[in-house]
Amino acid sequence: MSEPKRVDMDEVETREWLESLEAVIEREGPERAQFILETLIDKTRRTGGFIPFSGNTAYVNTIPTALEEHCPGNQEYEERLRSWMRWNAMATVVRTNRGEGDLGGHIASFQSLANMLGIGFNHFWKGPEHPRGADLLFIQGHASPGIYARAFLEGRITEEHLVNFRREVDGKGLSSYPHPKLMPDFWQFPTVSMGLGPLMAIYQARFLKYLQARDIADTEERKVWAFCGDGEMDEPESMGAIGMAAREKLDNLVFVVNCNLQRLDGPVRGNGKIIQELESDFRGAGWNVIKVIWGSYWDPLLAKDKDGILQQVMMDTVDGEYQNYKANDGAYVRQHFFGKHPKLLEMVSRMTDDDIWRLNRGGHDPNKIYAAFSAAVRHKGQPTVILVKTIKGYGMGKVAEGRNTAHQTKKLDDMTVHEFRDRFGIPIPDDKLHDIPFYKPADDTPEMKYLHERRQALGGYLPARREKADEVLQVPKLDVFAPVLEPTAEGREISTTQAYVRCLTQLLRDKSLGPRIVPILVDEARTFGMEGLFRQIGIYSVEPQKYEPVDRDQVMYYREDVKGQILQEGINEAGGMSSWIAAATSYSTNNRIMIPFYIYYSMFGLQRVGDLAWAAGDMRARGFLLGGTAGRTTLNGEGLQHED
């Protein structure tokens, strides 16, 4: 997605405008400058000028170098800890697949994510003992070996667990991906199949807002972080609810998209630019977008780029080329990237090929990542997406780094293991390398003390899952349903849907249980005779009702309220199911027992969300799902899909 080149017909006039703009920024700030620019654009359009909308910015970092917040941690310790985790994650997968073993696993994904996860764990993500509540992490499923590698250093899992990665029969192994059912005190959220994590994260973030608005739990300072792959964003579920997240003003939600430019078979957008594409998609939907493309070694070159040639070449170069650069060497980059313009060759003429090779991507620069994460957690009024450019298989050498085969690489020969050891400075002697031993220093080393200190300062270790809520709800006696049951005992017929609505109404009236019930609708309340609840308990809304409903003069008018109890998802079965999951797992994620009731139209409502239903089981969800009507008895005439 390359921006069209524009020709400047009057450079002097352009310079005058730019100088004026710089003066406004200096004297009155960027907000005033933005207002003036938007006013000028609006005036141009109103006078008939055509100014097409563009959701894209230049192919550089969103946060200028001068405005970056510097990472406060001990970077030497953090780099060594990351290196040990990289080694142990690699060793976990390679040892699992040694000899005739072919149990699978993935090395390359975590290698591209390691810096981001390290910064998050060391500086941002609040644990279960934090006074302001724990953050919720949706970890990219294929990066699970790296999370296990961290937990191993923390002492939360043993070497025996690592050896038994994907060997769980005897209860001493580790699950392939995040599975709460298999590791009930560790993983919180299953993020495979791909696409489920981003979708569920959005509705978890909205449910935190819902709990806060209804005074059930203090979730004001909690964040939901979702790590996704750039290839994963092609899943309809990944992007399908981003408009809702902006509409609901979910500033407690952060997406981090790991843009390593590759999926299993090859490039994500070989002929385009996935970061630019996602930027326009998210910005158009109303998100705050932060791009982390270039590392600090690029800063001096970008500072010299007064005529914008470097930035233009960065924009014109497609992702397939960027992948190729990191699959080769510095000489190749000099020829094929900087060689695109004579001024760029001159710019790097005093740099060696090794210097050029060290020009890093933003996702492998802790300071760039920290600045982006810090900006994201401080942003108000919008969800944030951080688009981070990385290298798939970072550190894996010629067998996988930037290669199309990176995702499938599970076995490494001795030479590659030797190179990996040297690259990350792992203190394992040559005569031990063939066995690929796990590395864990003594607990009293400065790095290990630092590892524990950082998590203790943030409220404990993550990921961690609560298996049982501290509270107990008082269940009403069966005679609460007497108004529903007694007429039927006398022989009066009643539909199952009507019985459900009456039972639900009785439960909502219970002073103890009623406030914890979460009725979830997907635009079918009138079908099921539930519209009476609109006025009774209200429909949750992020802001007060700004209009007078057309049926305001009726008893069952459409009432939206910031403290409303109903979650109305519209024509959106996946959204309804994701809200149900958020409520049904609240006993674990929020230490608050909630009881969701999701009734959907016919059984095909479940068929639309089968994978989410599987995820709900994995998460040990507790609630009620109801297929609202039976096709063979009440939907004749609706057609084959409804009747089956």
What name fits each language-model region?
Residues 141-145, 168-169, 225-235, 258-263, ...:
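Acidic, glycine-rich active-site loops and adjacent beta-strand->loop/helix elements
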Residues 259-487:
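Long, well-ordered, tryptophan-enriched scaffold segments
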Residues 156-168, 247-258, 280-287, 614-632:
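A glycine-rich helix N-cap at a beta->alpha junction
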Residues 3, 20-23, 70-78, 96-105, ...:
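Glycine- and acidic
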Residues 2-154, 420, 494-510, 521:
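N-terminal amphipathic, basic-rich helices that act as targeting or association modules
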Residues 70-101, 106-248, 271-272, 530-533, ...:
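Cofactor-binding active-site loop characterized by glycine-rich and histidine/acidic residues
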Residues 68-89, 110, 125-128, 136, ...:
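Non-catalytic terminal/interface segments that mediate subunit docking, oligomerization
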Residues 152-156, 240-245, 269-279, 296-299, ...:
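Short secondary-structure boundary/capping segments
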